[in-house]
């Protein structure tokens, strides 16, 4: 409970829950606190090969976030040690950025080139299209696996707490959080050497966020991600890329350092 309060007190979406739990905690004695029965998922990303020095190059691209929100002259390169936090006021612009580099949409101008050694895996913000099927979770995940053995597939589902009969439930009845956990199983299964994640923490509980946080910190390859969870971003990112309608601000700093620069500019 203390971990939840500490992590989400400043999170707009979960601040009320954090406040409520703090009030409950303040009223409880140590003897009254129940033993936790919560289980933690296990997130462990492995790479099929080491990424080359240059992972991705984007030059003079344009992304359209809708409603007249456009970012022009998008130019940056991604190195094999970069863990980039994508930030900015407009969520639609960030999603368009991910769709561009995941090659789901194209820029009307400019160049986008992935390195020859790179295999990337993309976690989209909206994953509903992946689950419009009545396949069991075992068969759903089997679609994305070279290894078809059920025990092997169940191992990746089990990491995200889909064990026993849970692994046989239909993919089209999952909650938002369950869909995210399945997508993370799929991402782990890919063995990609570059990970792209658009708001992966949005529907996760504290245990799953912590597991993903640890998994991305330990991952030796490049990552581009965005999240509303402050601790998640601060402990993973070594570079911040800010998207604005006026262009891109690219800084090799931590998230907290970036926040300080924003405060300084406002003074």
What are these regions (language model features)?
Residues 1-73, 267:
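Flexible nucleotide-interacting loop at or near the entrance of a catalytic core
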Residues 45-267:
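ABC ATP-binding cassette signature C-motif
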């Amino acid at each position: 409970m203390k971990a939840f309060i500490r992590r989400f007190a400043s999170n707009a979406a979960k601040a009320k829950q954090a406040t409520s739990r703090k009030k409950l905690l303040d009223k409880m004695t140590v003897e009254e606190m129940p033993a936790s029965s919560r289980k933690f998922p296990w997130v462990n990303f492995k790479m099929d090969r080491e990424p080359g020095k240059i992972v991705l190059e984007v030059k003079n691209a344009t992304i359209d976030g809708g409603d007249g929100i456009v970012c022009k002259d998008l130019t940056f390169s991604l190195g094999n040690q970069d863990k980039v936090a994508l930030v900015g006021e407009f969520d639609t612009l960030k999603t368009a950025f991910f769709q561009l580099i995941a090659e789901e949409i194209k820029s009307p101008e400019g160049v986008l080139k992935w390195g020859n050694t790179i295999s990337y895996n993309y976690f989209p913000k909206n994953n509903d299209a992946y689950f419009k099927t009545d396949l069991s979770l075992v068969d759903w995940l089997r679609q994305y696996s070279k290894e078809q053995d059920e025990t092997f597939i169940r191992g990746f589902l089990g990491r995200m707490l889909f064990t026993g009969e849970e692994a046989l439930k239909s993919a089209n009845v999952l909650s938002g959080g369950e869909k995210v956990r399945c997508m993370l199983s799929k991402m782990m299964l890919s063995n990609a050497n570059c990970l792209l994640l658009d708001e992966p923490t949005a529907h996760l509980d504290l245990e799953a966020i912590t597991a993903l946080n640890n998994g991305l910190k330990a991952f030796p390859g490049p990552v581009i991600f965005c999240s509303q969870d402050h601790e998640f971003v601060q402990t993973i990112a070594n570079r911040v890329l800010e998207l604005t309608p006026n262009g891109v601000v690219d800084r090799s700093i931590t998230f907290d350092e970036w926040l300080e620069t924003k405060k300084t500019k406002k003074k």
